[in-house]
From Swiss-Prot:
PANTHER family: 7-CYANO-7-DEAZAGUANINE SYNTHASE. Belongs to the QueC family. The gene is queC. This is 7-cyano-7-deazaguanine synthase. GO terms for molecular function: ATP binding; ligase activity, forming carbon-nitrogen bonds; zinc ion binding. Pathway: Purine metabolism; 7-cyano-7-deazaguanine biosynthesis. The lineage of its organism: Bacteria, Pseudomonadati, Pseudomonadota, Gammaproteobacteria, Legionellales.
Length: 226
């Protein structure tokens, strides 16, 4: 059976991505990162989601990039802001996060002799992060072609971003069609230890907008009524 490494955060997009990988018949190896994020409850969700999808193996890699600061998601001196609309690159951007994550996933994929890596990046209904764009995925694919044994032997590991051109509503509809239980997911940047959402950060607003446009009941549980 062909193998794939899937990056899962515990959120809506990455869970949909895992469902897509399962639907394609991949033997799924799920990978999460504890990088010092404040919303640690997403990792609790990720572990439950990996078990729910019966992945072959689930690993959590601990990184210390949070110590470097530079993002409201990791730096205690910076507050996670409410939804900022069309701000180009918000303070919740974690510098080079997807590059670091994909590099580690690439190494594991080589070890596993996996065919693909799947990431839930999207360039529509997103927070403006530069490492969630199609050109970024294409650039990392070039790196994978050049920097791996498989790549130079003509069997490059494919970097797949199946949600890259989907709106949040389209992503939710896709996941719903694949049987995803979104009540298991945690997307909020300010989620508490129980995984309850704030309802006001970028991620919460985009999630609410997605369910509304998809005309699917939002199962998100909030700290206070929003």
């Amino acid at each position: 059976m062909k193998k794939a490494v899937i990056l899962i955060s515990g959120g809506l997009d990455s869970t949909t991505c895992l469902a897509v990988a399962k639907s394609k018949g991949f033997a799924c190896y799920a990978l999460s990162f504890d990088y010092g994020q404040k919303h640690h409850s997403e990792l609790v969700a990720a572990e439950k989601i990996a078990a729910h999808f019966n992945v072959v193996r689930y690993e959590v890699v601990t990184l210390s990039i949070g110590k470097l600061g530079g993002s409201a998601l990791t730096d205690n001196s910076l507050d996670v802001p409410d939804y900022g609309g069309n701000e180009s690159i918000p303070i919740t951007y974690v510098p080079a996060r997807n590059t670091i994550f994909l590099s580690i996933a690439l190494g594991w994929a080589e070890i596993l002799d996996a065919e693909s890596i799947l990431i839930g990046a999207s360039a529509i209904d997103y927070s403006g992060y530069p490492d969630c764009r199609p050109e970024y995925i294409a650039a990392f694919q070039n790196l994978a072609n050049l920097a791996t044994k498989r790549g130079i032997e003509g069997h490059s590991i494919k970097i797949e971003a199946p949600l890259i051109h989907l709106s949040k509503a389209e992503t939710i509809k896709l996941g719903y069609s694949l049987g995803v239980d979104y009540s298991m997911t945690v997307s909020c940047y300010r989620a508490n230890e129980e995984g309850l959402a704030c309802g006001y950060c970028d991620s919460c607003e985009l999630r609410k907008k997605g369910f509304k446009e998809a005309e699917i009941k939002d199962p998100t549980q909030y700290i206070t009524k929003v």
